[in-house]
Amino acid sequence: MHASFRFLLRSAVVGACAVAPWIVQAQSVVVPAVVPTVAPSMKSGGSGQFVCGGVGSDESVAMRAAMKDHPLSLLFARSSGAYLADVAVTVKNANGDTALSLVSNGPICLVDLPPGRYTVEAASDGITKSQVVTLGSGSKTADFRF
């Protein structure tokens, strides 16, 4: 081999070896998938606002994370613990007037109502259950099992 060809070959090998770690490192970079964790948007109804959801793990995580930001959270499940949707909900104020009426499209409802005492009635499969909640500082959770 001619000396100039050997020099060229050696330069190419040394250059490739110098760049190889960068190439391997660039190929092994893992970019995590971005999963949206946004709860559905609020709806108006009666004297308050609400949002129901929690179907699917991403939405459930987002809804549970948002519970602390709302005066009232409603959870619906079967006695076995399986999540439940299509629950008819009526919230009445201390005077017995309907403050909010909705049908949940998921096992979690986040409710924004003014401070006060409310009776929450939830109905599923012909069974109606009720709980009294007092809203003020902090957030409250009413858990309904059917």
Predicted regions and their residues:
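Short amphipathic beta-strand segments in non-cytosolic proteins
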Residues: A88-A99
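Short, surface-exposed beta-strand/beta-hairpin micro-motifs centered on an aromatic residue
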Residues: G106-D112
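A short tyrosine-centered beta-strand micro-motif
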Residues: G116-A122
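Short beta-strand segments within Ig-like beta-sandwich modules, predominantly Fibronectin type-III
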Residues: A99-S104, V133-T134
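Hydrophobic loop/turn residues within beta-sheet-rich immunoglobulin-like superfamily modules
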Residues: L113-G116, G136
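Bacterial N-terminal signal peptides that target proteins for export
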Residues: H2-A12
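Primarily secretory-pathway and cell-envelope proteins
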Residues: Q25-V87, S124-F146
